[in-house]
């Protein structure tokens, strides 16, 4: 019997011999990084990364199985999806010590690009059961769809860090992004942050007002940040 006697589902032998399902993914990803020392206190780097794949899937469901009513004379489908993500990152990092000050400046730029391409075909209720061909289904029993998307995000960022005598710390950062998923007048947005900290135990120990056996580390910290993010591709269209 083609049916499992205990449930409304196809017998595994029926599935193996009559239904055919295929899924394949061909994927490639990689990354290349280059770094150059301009001076002892300054280096620049560039990184490129890629992730791409093609996925194909097909289904052939035989007639008279445990299927939707409209699929009782069989169903076939073929789907292909292509995806590509590529990123570029450039950074310049400068770090130097001036007396009791440690200073660091990071500047950079990045670009991300994502592309997708999807196509889907489906046919059902064949004129000749189990003859899997799109020509074997009427116009009303076929469906073809295709969708392609492209998204690009470009960003520029910077961060300045300073410390004094391992006691006072200040960090200021900012980033501006330009995205293709927002309207032209709003596609640029900036989000900064600032933070500071004071290691009061270091100051008290330097003044001789605190024994590290009583308290060896204490820090006060305050920060403020603004967050920015774009949206998915075509999500603003109705």
Q: Which positions does each model-derived feature cover?
A:
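Surface-exposed loop/turn segments flanking beta-strands in extracellular/periplasmic regions
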Residues: 1-14, 59-75, 117-144, 237-238
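Outer-membrane beta-barrel transmembrane strands
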Residues: 12-59, 77-97, 104, 116-118, ...
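Short loop/turn motifs that connect adjacent beta-strands in outer-membrane beta-barrel proteins
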Residues: 41, 97-103, 167, 201-218
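Residue-level detector of the transmembrane beta-barrel scaffold of outer-membrane proteins
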Residues: 43-45, 102-106, 169-171, 193, ...
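Outer-membrane beta-barrel and related beta-rich outer-membrane complex signature
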Residues: 50-66, 71, 111-126, 182-186, ...
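Short, well-ordered amphipathic alpha-helices
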Residues: 89-94, 193-205
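Outer-membrane beta-barrel domain signature, especially the mid-to-C-terminal portions
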Residues: 135, 185, 191-193, 235
């Amino acid at each position: 019997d083609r049916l499992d006697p205990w449930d409304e589902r196809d017998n595994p032998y029926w599935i193996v011999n009559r239904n055919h399902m295929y899924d394949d993914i061909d994927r490639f990803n990689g990354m290349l990084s280059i770094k150059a020392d301009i001076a002892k206190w300054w280096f620049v780097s560039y990184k490129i990364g890629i992730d791409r794949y093609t996925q194909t899937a097909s289904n052939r469901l035989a007639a008279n199985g445990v299927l939707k009513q409209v699929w009782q004379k069989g169903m076939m489908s073929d789907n292909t999806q292509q995806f590509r993500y590529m990123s570029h990152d450039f950074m310049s990092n400068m770090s130097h010590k001036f007396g009791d000050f440690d200073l660091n400046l990071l500047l950079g730029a990045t670009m991300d690009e994502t592309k997708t391409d999807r196509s889907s075909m489906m046919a059902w209720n064949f004129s000749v059961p189990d003859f899997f061909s799109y020509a074997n289904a009427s116009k009303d029993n076929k469906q073809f769809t295709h969708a392609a998307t492209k998204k690009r995000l470009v960003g520029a960022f910077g961060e300045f860090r300073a410390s004094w005598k391992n006691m006072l710390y200040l960090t200021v950062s900012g980033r501006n992004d330009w995205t293709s998923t927002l309207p032209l007048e709003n596609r640029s947005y900036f989000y900064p942050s600032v933070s500071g900290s004071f290691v009061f135990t270091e100051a008290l120990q330097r003044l001789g007002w605190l024994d590290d056996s009583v308290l060896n580390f204490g820090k006060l910290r305050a920060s403020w940040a603004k967050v920015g993010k774009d949206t998915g591709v075509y999500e603003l269209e109705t």
